């Protein structure tokens, strides 16, 4: 018999991960809710491919030009004569917004140039053409 020493099993230390998992899930929900998603124009457009396409960081206004040369701004069809007035109206809300033109690969170049001229006339500072990487 030993005196003074106890021979008992030592309990293993356990780390409670419940609070850490709660924080991780809250952060995940926060990032999902606050992340910004890229808006599309709402019209099916077959974009041409480009070997040196660069992604646009921020886009405010989307203009889609279909193969039938119909022009859509924010999912509404607009006549080519009304493009500048529509863009001027949209620039009142977002004065520094950039413009992304999503032209179908079969759309006429003249229609794209008319939209670009109207955008410059409306005061758009940044214009980008949407393309897909091959």
Curated annotation (Swiss-Prot):
One of its GO terms (molecular function) is transmembrane transporter activity. Signal peptide: none annotated. The chain crosses the membrane at residues 18-38. Involved in the TonB-dependent energy-dependent transport of various receptor-bound substrates. The accessory proteins ExbB and ExbD seem to form a complex with TonB. Residues 39-134 are periplasmic. GO terms for biological process: protein transport. Its main location: membrane. It is a single-pass type II membrane protein. The gene is exbD2. GO terms for cellular component: plasma membrane. Residues 1-17 are cytoplasmic. Pfam families: ExbD. It is found in: Cell inner membrane. This is Biopolymer transport protein exbD2. InterPro entries: ExbD (IPR003400). Keywords: Cell inner membrane, Cell membrane, Membrane, Protein transport, Transmembrane, Transmembrane helix, Transport. Belongs to the ExbD/TolR family.
């Amino acid at each position: 018999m030993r005196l003074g020493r106890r021979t008992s099993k030592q309990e293993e230390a356990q780390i409670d991960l419940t609070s850490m998992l709660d924080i991780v899930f809250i952060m995940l929900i926060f990032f999902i809710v606050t992340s910004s998603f890229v808006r599309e124009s709402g019209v099916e457009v077959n974009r041409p491919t480009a070997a040196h396409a660069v992604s646009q960081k921020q886009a405010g206004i989307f203009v889609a030009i279909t193969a039938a040369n119909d022009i859509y701004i924010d999912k509404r069809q607009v006549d080519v004569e009304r493009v500048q007035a529509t863009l001027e109206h949209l620039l009142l809300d977002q004065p520094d917004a950039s413009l992304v033109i999503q032209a179908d690969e079969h759309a006429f170049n003249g229609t794209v140039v008319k939209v670009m001229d109207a955008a410059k006339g409306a005061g758009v500072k940044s214009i980008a053409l949407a393309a897909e990487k091959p």
